[in-house]
């Protein structure tokens, strides 16, 4: 029989995490909110070079909305995977067939809102459809059997706090603290786990599909005409799960991002991006438990995405790109075509670039 303690433990862990999330912000308010950008610094940044555009595809914006501004961002992400990497970190020249061919699409919608000039709240939800077939059958050209499912993905809540805003007259970048809770709505609604077990790479840090997760991140951005450079590192802890009455433990996850934007036309928001992405599952857990599920020797994916961003109107922007796997270990080799649009709204009637 399944343990009756696991659900209670998960509820307690979730409640504790919410308490720590809100408590940490309260503590910052009481002790560290003296370390915030001054109004003059924010005004100086807002008046500096920063073209209105979509920005990077594969990282949440480091700088945050001004108070009272909102954006809605539909993001369409797809995956084509027919090869895989072995137990050693290797290049595409060493990739192998199998074990499965996987094709998936995953629309994601993110809504973000500026609570203050220092805090931004976000929420994201997604759908996923995937089709998977064993490699031997696929290579032989035989029909079926396919494993396929369509359903709801996971739901994320994101809180960002920016203690440092960049100075256009010095090398100082913006620095933002990133906190995310992933609720396993895919599991709650019965969506089957896709091969590999990860939510697709994309806008948010990759997490384990269908599992309660807690992410802490540190991000930065610096604008220097005609370039914008941003990046971040994120650590995700997955709560213990349960399978056939056994408590399951998977490795924690580390995501990194490094993005270069080069603007060709400021007024049109036209730029090209080079976006570097890595996802690494660890051989340890923050709670000290041994790993009994997933890639016990760890896994790594390194990808690079060329992208183009553009402006449609003074409140609507978009971007399109393709993410290519350039190295991997115990992971799928895949390409990920993707595109997004983003609509801005401001209570003053005039939107501002973050």
Name the predicted role of every residue range.
Residues 31-33, 60-69, 101, 118, ...:
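Short loop/turn motifs that connect adjacent beta-strands in outer-membrane beta-barrel proteins
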Residues 74-78, 123-127, 177-183, 231-235, ...:
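Transmembrane beta-barrel strands of outer-membrane/channel proteins
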Residues 85-89, 93, 244-354:
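Outer membrane beta-barrel transmembrane domains
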Residues 126-249, 296:
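Outer-membrane pore/translocation modules
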Residues 63-65, 113, 125, 161-163, ...:
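Residue-level signature of outer-membrane beta-barrel architecture
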Residues 55-57, 68-70, 105-109, 153-159, ...:
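Hydrophobic, lipid-facing positions within transmembrane beta-strands of outer-membrane proteins
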Residues 68-80, 198-199, 203-291, 343:
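Detector for outer-membrane/organellar transmembrane beta-barrel domains
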Residues 28-86, 91, 167-176, 346-354:
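Outer-membrane beta-barrel biogenesis signature
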């Amino acid at each position: 029989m399944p343990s009756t303690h696991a659900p209670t433990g998960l509820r307690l862990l979730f409640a504790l995490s919410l308490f720590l999330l809100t408590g940490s912000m309260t503590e910052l308010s009481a002790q560290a909110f003296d370390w915030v950008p001054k109004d003059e610094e924010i005004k100086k940044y807002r008046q500096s070079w920063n073209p209105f555009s979509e920005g990077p595809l594969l990282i949440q914006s480091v700088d945050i909305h001004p108070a009272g501004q909102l954006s809605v961002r539909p993001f369409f992400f797809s995956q084509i995977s027919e090869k895989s990497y072995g137990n050693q970190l290797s290049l595409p020249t060493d990739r192998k067939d199998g074990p499965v061919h996987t094709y998936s699409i995953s629309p994601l919608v993110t809504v973000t809102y500026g609570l203050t000039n220092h805090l931004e709240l976000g929420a994201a939800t997604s759908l996923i459809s995937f089709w998977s077939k064993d490699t031997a059958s696929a290579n032989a050209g035989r029909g079926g059997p396919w494993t396929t499912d369509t359903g709801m993905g996971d739901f994320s809540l994101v809180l960002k706090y920016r203690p440092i805003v960049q100075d256009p007259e010095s090398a100082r970048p913006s620095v933002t603290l990133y906190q995310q809770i992933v609720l396993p709505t895919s599991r709650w609604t019965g969506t089957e786990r896709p091969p590999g077990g990860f939510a697709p790479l994309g806008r948010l840090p990759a997490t384990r599909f269908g599992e309660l997760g807690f992410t802490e991140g540190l991000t930065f951005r610096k604008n220097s005409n005609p370039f914008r450079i941003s990046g971040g590192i994120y650590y995700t802890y997955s709560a213990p799960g349960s399978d056939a009455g056994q408590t399951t433990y998977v490795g924690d996850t580390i995501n990194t991002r490094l993005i270069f934007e080069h603007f060709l036309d400021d007024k049109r928001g036209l730029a090209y991006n080079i976006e570097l992405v890595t996802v690494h599952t660890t051989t340890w857990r923050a709670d000290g438990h041994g790993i009994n599920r997933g890639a016990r020797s760890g896994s790594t994916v390194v990808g690079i995405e060329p992208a183009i961003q553009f402006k449609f109107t003074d409140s609507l922007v978009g971007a399109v790109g393709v993410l290519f796997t350039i190295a991997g270990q115990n992971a799928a080799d895949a390409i990920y075509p993707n595109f997004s649009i983003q609509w801005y709204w401001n209570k003053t009637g005039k939107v501002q670039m973050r």
